[in-house]
Each structure stands twice: as C-alpha cells, then as structure tokens.
Design a protein with these regions (language model features):
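Glycine-rich, basic loop-to-helix element that forms the pyrophosphate-binding segment
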Residues: 29-46
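Short, flexible, basic/aromatic active-site loop/helix in glycosyltransferases
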Residues: 82-83, 97-114
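Acidic donor-binding loop at a coil-to-helix junction in glycosyltransferase catalytic cores
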Residues: 141-147, 154
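Short aromatic/hydrophobic "clamp" motif used to bind/position activated sugar donors
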Residues: 51
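Conserved donor NDP-sugar-binding/catalytic core segment of glycosyltransferases
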Residues: 63-93
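Acidic donor-binding segment of Leloir-type glycosyltransferases
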Residues: 1-28
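Non-catalytic, C-terminal membrane-associated alpha-helical segments of glycosyltransferases
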Residues: 183-187, 201-270
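Acidic donor-binding/catalytic loop of UDP-sugar-dependent glycosyltransferases
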Residues: 5, 9, 58-71
Length: 270
C-alpha cells in the first residue's frame, strides 16, 4: 500500500476539484496488492458507460478524454487505445526512453499474437466487462494484454486506435528503476506464455552479452561517435546499444525466474 501521502494529496485535489464543479472520488483497494485489483475496485464503483484508464506516472494532455471517447460513437467499438508519448525528462535514461519511443502503443498493437493496449491509455465500454469479466486481480504484470486479448478473442467488439488521444508517460530515471521495469516485462512474458502459450523471448546468455558489448565498442561506437561529433545524430544513438543490452538481459532474467501464481488465473466479475 502507498505510504507517500497519497490520501492527503487526493483530499487536497478533491477540494480543488469541487471548487471547479468537478467530482473526484478517492477509492481504496488494500486487500490485494496489484494495480489490476485497484482498477477492478474503480470499475465496480463506476456508473458510466465508458471507462478511461491511465496511470499515476502519466499526464493526460488536454482533450484526451474527448479524443478517447469519440470512437465509441460507433456502437460496435468496445475498446479504444490511445497513444503514449514521453514526458520530457532530464536524465540520460529518460531521454533514451523518449528517443526509443518506449511504450508507444504502436508496438503493442503490432503484437504477433494479438493486438493490445497498455492501461496507461485505454478506454473500455462497460458492457465488455459484463461479458468477459474484470481484470485478473492477482496478476502483477501483463494484465492489460490479458484483458485486451480476452476482448479480441472472445467477443465481437471492435478495437480502435485513437492516436490523437495522448498521455505523456514519465519514464524511469535511474538504473534501478530501469532494471525493475524490464524484469517486470520479463515476468509478463512468462505469465502470458502460461495463460496463452505465446512465444517466450529466447534466453540471453552471458556469452552473447559479451559478444554484443564487444561489437558495440569495436564497430558501432566509433561510427556512431563520429556521426555525433559531426552533429549528424544525437549522442544518445551512440550509447543506445549497451542500454538496449541491459534491458534485454533483465527482461530475460525476469522471464526465466517467473512463474504464474495459481491465484493469478482468477477472473473477477461485475
């Protein structure tokens, strides 16, 4: 559970919203430690036909809701995926993530098994939850893909990509945060493999890691460094390979060490 003054911050936000004629409801989910359980709590408390999802580390742009909701004018649409851009950061890793377009929904929508959108920017029609259930509350990662895949494979609801419905995401600023992020991505791979049989990424060996790092030092860095010195490309491009390698190593480790807990197979219902 949060210990960073979240309740106090929300109480202050509630008062400010009330002064502007808006309503904010502070809901608490403290029985199950997962973001998906928290989302289920909010879904049950909601009364609207369209539910919009974003994350605490995201900043929706003006007109986000209107652009996200617009495709639902088509009664056949059950799922709308908005785009995720980087919130401009100061650290090297934040700038790297922005340069790599990390977390763009275009990547997840191109998933070879089935398209999906991340809950950082997602709209779902309430009727969908009545048909296929809520998020798996005991999943700790991969629940957004699971939800979208259940919609895509078990229903006739259409998915629409609303590229102009934008949120900005605050990327990881430290090595520790980056490691945690990519380990979690690896666990997600494993969980979705156990639920759907999707392919796992191949295991990353230290021998391959040494080879790729050596290749970067001897071949890629001299070329990319010269290009950066000449002002043709950003310096970030010159150091992207070792960061990519670090991410891949941690994703592989997360996948290798994970196993889907039995309770995580449970689907809650409205």
């Amino acid at each position: 559970n949060s210990s960073d003054r979240t309740p106090n911050i929300l109480a202050s936000a509630q008062k400010e919203a009330e002064s502007q004629g808006l309503t904010i409801r502070h809901l608490t989910e403290n029985k199950i430690q997962s973001s998906y359980a928290a989302r289920n709590t909010a879904i049950r408390a909601s009364t609207g036909e369209i539910l919009a999802f974003t994350d605490a580390d995201c900043r929706p742009l003006p007109q986000w809701i209107s652009h996200l909701v617009q495709p639902f004018a088509d009664p056949a649409v059950g799922l709308v995926v908005g785009e995720i851009n980087a919130l401009p950061g100061e650290t090297l890793l934040e700038k790297y993530a922005e340069r790599q377009s990390m977390m763009t929904q275009k990547d997840t929508l191109a998933h070879p098994f089935c398209p999906y959108g991340q809950t950082a920017n997602l709209g779902i029609r309430r009727q969908v939850f009545a048909e296929i259930g809520l998020f798996r509350p005991y999943m700790t990662t991969g629940g957004d893909a699971d939800m979208c895949w259940r919609i895509g494979r078990e229903t006739a609801w259409k998915l629409v990509f609303a590229e102009t419905a934008l949120v900005q995401h605050r990327h990881r600023a430290t090595i520790a945060e980056l490691k945690s992020q990519w380990r979690r991505y690896g666990r997600s791979n494993r969980y979705l493999h156990e639920l759907y049989g999707v392919d796992l990424m191949r295991d990353f060996t230290w021998k391959e890691s040494v080879y790729r790092l050596s290749r970067w030092l001897l071949k890629e860095l001299p070329v990319a460094g010269a290009s950066a010195i000449a002002g043709k490309t950003p310096w970030l491009d010159a150091i992207a390979s070792p960061i990519n390698l670090y991410c891949a190593i941690n994703r592989s480790a997360g996948q290798r060490e994970a196993k889907l807990p039995e309770p995580a197979k449970t689907i809650e219902w409205l």
